[in-house]
């Protein structure tokens, strides 16, 4: 049986909020089977819970933000959520003493190391997957994202920025998902932004924690980071990282073929909602026999690095 996963023990880290620029403490805790992924704002009394749910994603302008019916929010969840998807963590309590998850280095890599440091434990309950059964597509102008049936999790993402530092040869990335592929090919890709946009955001009191330490920054001509890129196509890899995190808002790893062109947090969420709203388009599956599991989901998360 392919089993659900949680952490072996709790672990804590301190970082900076991307938008506030303030110190943020993040605590990750084990959770019982079938708990799912639950975010908590512990700076509020009583603490406010945000179960991972695509319908709770109500702001996707600058990040993925969960907002409840009272207007309480928790922002910038996508990189941590991507790390959870990458390692197949089904059940976890995520506590944060601020309105946003710390940005760390702008990638999912620090969260991967944090989760592996806490240790991953299998639980005595069958892991549920969402299997795509029918073609689903959403569009927004020339942007689009789609799912097709596929026995695995395949991703194909294309970006299109008219910028001299983003050539045609670094605008597409394709990958067959596995924990190893995510850790080595995707998790280290950092978020990116354009200097003119960052200056405007900071003038509006946003992105105050943004810096060359936690983002790739481009001016009109080049990349400003002294150390350059971690991959020549780091930007499109990061957009794939974002998509993996956004799609894991379903709370389950997905079996299907995802393809996107110029998609962002909003369209990723729209696709996920469109899939789940169509009962014919998907089903829950579990696997009693490891031989039947799609290739990318076979390897245990403990053998990663």
Swiss-Prot record:
Zn(2+) binds at residues 79, 238, 242. It catalyses: a UDP-3-O-[(3R)-3-hydroxyacyl]-N-acetyl-alpha-D-glucosamine + H2O = a UDP-3-O-[(3R)-3-hydroxyacyl]-alpha-D-glucosamine + acetate. Its cofactor is Zn(2+). It is an enzyme of class 3 (hydrolase). The keyword Zinc applies. Its EC number is 3.5.1.108. InterPro entries: Ribosomal_Su5_D2-typ_SF, UDP-acyl_GlcNac_deAcase, UDP-acyl_GlcNac_deAcase_C, UDP-acyl_N-AcGlcN_deAcase_N. GO terms for molecular function: metal ion binding; UDP-3-O-acyl-N-acetylglucosamine deacetylase activity. One of its GO terms (cellular component) is membrane. The active site is at 265 (proton donor). Pathway: Glycolipid biosynthesis; lipid IV(A) biosynthesis; lipid IV(A) from (3R)-3-hydroxytetradecanoyl-[acyl-carrier-protein] and UDP-N-acetyl-alpha-D-glucosamine: step 2/6. Keywords: Hydrolase, Lipid A biosynthesis, Lipid biosynthesis, Lipid metabolism, Metal-binding, Zinc. It comes from the Bacteria. Disulfide bonds: none annotated. GO terms for biological process: lipid A biosynthetic process. SUPFAM superfamilies: Ribosomal protein S5 domain 2-like. Belongs to the LpxC family. PANTHER family: UDP-3-O-ACYL-N-ACETYLGLUCOSAMINE DEACETYLASE 1, MITOCHONDRIAL-RELATED. Catalyzes the hydrolysis of UDP-3-O-myristoyl-N-acetylglucosamine to form UDP-3-O-myristoylglucosamine and acetate, the committed step in lipid A biosynthesis. This is UDP-3-O-acyl-N-acetylglucosamine deacetylase. It comes from Haemophilus influenzae (strain 86-028NP).
């Amino acid at each position: 049986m392919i089993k659900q996963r949680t952490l072996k023990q709790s672990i804590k880290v301190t970082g900076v909020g991307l938008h506030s620029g303030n110190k943020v403490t993040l605590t990750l805790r084990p959770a019982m089977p079938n708990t799912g992924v639950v975010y908590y704002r512990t700076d509020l009394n009583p603490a406010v819970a945000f179960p991972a749910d695509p319908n709770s994603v109500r702001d996707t302008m600058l990040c993925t933000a969960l907002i409840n019916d009272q207007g309480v929010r928790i922002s910038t969840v996508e990189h941590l959520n991507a790390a959870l998807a990458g390692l197949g963590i089904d059940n976890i309590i995520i506590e944060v003493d601020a309105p946003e998850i710390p940005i760390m280095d702008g990638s999912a890599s620090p969260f991967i190391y944090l989760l592996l440091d806490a240790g991953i434990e299998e639980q005595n309950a069958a892991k549920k997957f969402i299997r795509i059964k029918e073609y689903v597509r959403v569009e927004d102008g020339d942007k689009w994202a789609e799912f097709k049936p596929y026995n695995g999790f395949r991703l194909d993402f294309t970006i299109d920025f008219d910028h001299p530092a983003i050539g045609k040869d670094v605008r597409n990335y394709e990958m067959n998902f596995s924990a190893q592929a995510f850790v080595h090919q995707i998790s280290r890709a950092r978020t990116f932004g354009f200097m003119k946009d960052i200056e405007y955001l900071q003038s509006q009191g946003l992105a105050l924690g943004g810096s060359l330490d936690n983002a790739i920054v481009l001016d009109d001509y080049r990349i400003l980071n002294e150390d350059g890129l971690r991959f020549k196509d780091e930007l499109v890899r990061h957009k794939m990282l974002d998509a993996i995190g956004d799609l894991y808002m379903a709370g389950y790893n997905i079996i299907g073929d995802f393809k996107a062109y110029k998609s962002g947090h909003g369209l990723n969420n729209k696709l996920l909602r469109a899939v789940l709203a169509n009962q014919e388009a998907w089903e829950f599956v579990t696997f009693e026999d490891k031989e039947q599991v799609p290739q990318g989901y076979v390897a245990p998360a403990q053998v990663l690095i």
